[in-house]
């Protein structure tokens, strides 16, 4: 049986609001740069997030959200931007940050609790040794990412239910969406990407991706400027040579040769014409 431990920190909402008013920002931004360049970046990311929240009616999904926090640049940025909107009065939901420690060797257990506590962010950290499950089931030559991700998602769903959350919030950005689209196209033989909003198979939880319009490059710059204590995603040593890396390089080359194509591709995913494709399930060619 897997060892399971849970760590909580709960705070009164008013404590965060009082701290925010004191410095005219959420505490997480107290050490943020004051440069014009950073402010433009921050506003751009907030604009993209607000657009996604509106386009996919994310605010209709309930009043308490579980925000997945892996310790990577995207999840840190996601949490900070959500807290920024909440402080501005534009996000009327309760936020609970959640990290699932999957037992990966060398995982620095102190980083996330120290970070979240220092900014009085409500959080839950749970230990579930899914790493051992993955290594037992797969050969060393196989990529762990897919099974690891499925086990992580299942545990996050369970935690969301236990905490009374209506939605699980993930940090996938524009580039993740496009890479997934091309992976499905080239390797899965289907047209599919990552939706901004969906329901889980059981139908009791929403999965939201407020960063679907945000560029990875912007998230990288934001993370560096905010000096988040990044936890690398190569602890298990299974990241090299993945198909996703090939898609990432392909998209970089396309963007280098034809700037602006990534944004065009994202717009295309929201402008589908079933009659111009070949799928009979989505268009009745017999009566056309």
Curated annotation (Swiss-Prot):
EC identifiers of the protein: 2.8.1.-
Record's function text: Catalyzes the ATP-dependent 2-thiolation of cytidine in position 32 of tRNA, to form 2-thiocytidine (s(2)C32). The sulfur atoms are provided by the cysteine/cysteine desulfurase (IscS) system.
Ranges spanned by the short sequence motif PP-loop motif, renumbered to the chain: 70-75
One GO cellular component term noted in the UniProt record for this chain: cytoplasm
Cofactor binding note of this UniProt entry: Binds 1 [4Fe-4S] cluster per subunit. The cluster is chelated by three Cys residues, the fourth Fe has a free coordination site that may bind a sulfur atom transferred from the persulfide of IscS.
Pathway(s) served: tRNA modification
Quaternary structure, from the entry: Homodimer.
GO molecular function, one term: sulfurtransferase activity
Protein name per UniProt: tRNA-cytidine(32) 2-sulfurtransferase
Cysteine pairs bridged by disulfides in the record: none
Compartments reported by the entry: Cytoplasm
Names of the cofactor(s): Mg(2+); [4Fe-4S] cluster
Additional note from the record: The thiolation reaction likely consists of two steps: a first activation step by ATP to form an adenylated intermediate of the target base of tRNA, and a second nucleophilic substitution step of the sulfur (S) atom supplied by the hydrosulfide attached to the Fe-S cluster.
CDD domains (UniProt xref): TtcA-like
Highest rank taxon of the organism: Bacteria
GO terms classed as biological process: tRNA thio-modification
Residues annotated for [4Fe-4S] cluster binding in this entry: 145, 148, 236
InterPro entries linked to this entry: Rossmann-like_a/b/a_fold, TilS/TtcA_N, tRNA_Cyd_32_2_STrfase, tRNA_thiolation_TtcA_Ctu1
Keywords: 4Fe-4S, ATP-binding, Cytoplasm, Iron, Iron-sulfur, Magnesium, Metal-binding, Nucleotide-binding, RNA-binding, Transferase, tRNA processing, tRNA-binding
Major subcellular site: cytoplasm
């Amino acid at each position: 049986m897997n060892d399971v431990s849970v760590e909580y920190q709960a705070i009164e909402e008013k404590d965060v609001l009082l701290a925010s008013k004191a410095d005219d920002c959420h505490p997480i931004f107290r050490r943020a740069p004051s440069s014009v360049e950073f402010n433009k970046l921050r506003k751009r990311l907030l604009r993209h997030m607000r657009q996604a929240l509106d386009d996919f009616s994310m605010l209709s999904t309930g009043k308490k959200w579980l925000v997945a926090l892996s310790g990577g640049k995207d999840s840190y940025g996601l949490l900070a931007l959500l807290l920024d909107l909440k402080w501005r009065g534009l996000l009327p939901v309760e936020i609970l940050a959640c990290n699932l420690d999957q037992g990966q060797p060398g995982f620095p257990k102190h980083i996330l609790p120290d970070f979240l506590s220092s900014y009085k962010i409500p959080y839950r950290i749970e230990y579930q040794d899914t790493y051992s499950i993955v290594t037992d089931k797969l050969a060393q030559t196989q990529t762990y990412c897919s099974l690891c991700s499925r086990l992580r998602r299942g545990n996050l769903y369970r935690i969301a239910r236990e905490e009374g959350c209506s939605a699980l919030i993930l940090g996938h950005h524009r580039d993740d969406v496009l890479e997934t689209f091309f992976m499905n196209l080239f390797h899965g033989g289907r047209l599919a990407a990552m939706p901004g909003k969906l329901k889980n198979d059981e139908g009791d939880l929403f999965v939201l991706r407020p960063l679907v319009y945000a560029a990875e490059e912007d998230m990288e710059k934001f993370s560096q400027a905010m000096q988040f204590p990044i936890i690398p995603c190569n602890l298990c040593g299974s990241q090299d040579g993945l198909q996703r890396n090939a898609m990432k390089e392909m998209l970089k080359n396309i963007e280098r040769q034809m700037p602006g194509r990534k944004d065009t591709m994202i717009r295309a995913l929201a402008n589908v014409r079933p009659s111009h494709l070949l799928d009979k399930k989505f268009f009745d060619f017999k009566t056309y």
